[in-house]
């Protein structure tokens, strides 16, 4: 669900990360805010902002882009009124990822507008731009990256610490919370200042009823049911 321009640094690493990441991180709910700004060679700056709701409980992660109701209503009204075969718009649905005891992932999307639960088989992950990187899904980044970064002695919340890495013309900073096992802030920027990305996590109370327990009555479909 997250649309970002993070450098490859944030997207993968195979090193062990037991020093920084717990095998069983605490259950958590959060609102995540994203900001991405790029200034092109013609001098025009383009800035994007978006937010998502994020919940992690045991081996389940739920993420949902927060779309203003009038915009969602207008989109679905136009989409549903269009004649012919309907395609599934995964960006308008909540993403639900679970991991079983064998380490296998299951990807589903919950479309509250149409009361549909759409299962995505492994071979179709590319259709929804899904990367089955459990560490990054569960912790928002791969915590192994912290071992490649320099810890900083900067002011930070309790049980949190800033880390930084400079590589080429790029600088990345992460405020990692060892208590909550997530980054509270991720910043990535070019040293010339023409590209900046920021992700900020605001902790919320866990809902009284988890969203994946509110799917009674949803029609279960396969993503391939929407193919032409």
Can you describe what each PLM-predicted range is?
Residues 4-13:
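Sec-dependent N-terminal signal peptides
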Residues 14-18:
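N-terminal signal peptide c-region/cleavage motif recognized by signal peptidases
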Residues 19-66, 70-72, 221-228:
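N-terminal cleavable signal peptides for secretion/export
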Residues 22-24, 146, 155-160, 167-172, ...:
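Non-transmembrane domains of secretory- and envelope-associated proteins
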Residues 24-35, 59-64, 105-106, 155-164, ...:
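Short, hydrophobic/aromatic-rich segments at coil-to-beta transitions
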Residues 45, 49-135:
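An acidic-aromatic
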Residues 46-48, 136-151, 194-197:
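A short, amphipathic edge element
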Residues 51-56, 96-100, 147-156, 174-175:
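Short, exposed beta-strand/loop patches in secreted or surface proteins that constitute
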């Amino acid at each position: 669900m997250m649309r970002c321009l993070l450098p490859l640094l944030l997207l993968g690493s195979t090193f062990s990360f037991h020093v920084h990441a717990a095998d069983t991180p605490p259950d958590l709910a959060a609102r995540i805010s994203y900001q991405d700004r790029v200034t092109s060679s013609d001098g025009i700056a383009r800035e994007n902002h978006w937010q998502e709701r994020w919940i992690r409980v045991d081996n389940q992660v739920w993420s949902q882009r927060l779309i203003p109701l009038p915009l969602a209503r207008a989109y679905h009204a136009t989409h549903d009124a269009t004649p012919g075969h309907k395609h599934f718009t995964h960006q308008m649905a909540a993403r639900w990822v679970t991991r079983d005891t064998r380490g296998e992932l299951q990807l589903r999307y919950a479309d509250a507008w149409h009361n549909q639960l759409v299962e995505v088989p492994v071979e179709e992950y590319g259709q929804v731009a899904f990367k089955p990187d459990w560490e990054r899904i569960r912790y928002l980044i791969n915590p192994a990256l912290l071992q490649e970064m320099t810890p900083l002695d900067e002011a930070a919340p309790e049980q949190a610490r800033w880390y930084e890495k400079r590589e080429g013309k790029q600088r990345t900073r992460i405020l990692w919370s060892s208590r909550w096992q997530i980054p509270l802030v991720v910043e990535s920027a070019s040293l010339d200042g023409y590209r900046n990305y920021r992700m900020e996590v605001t902790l919320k109370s866990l809902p009284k009823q988890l969203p994946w327990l509110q799917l009674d009555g949803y029609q279960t479909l396969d993503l391939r049911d929407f193919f032409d």
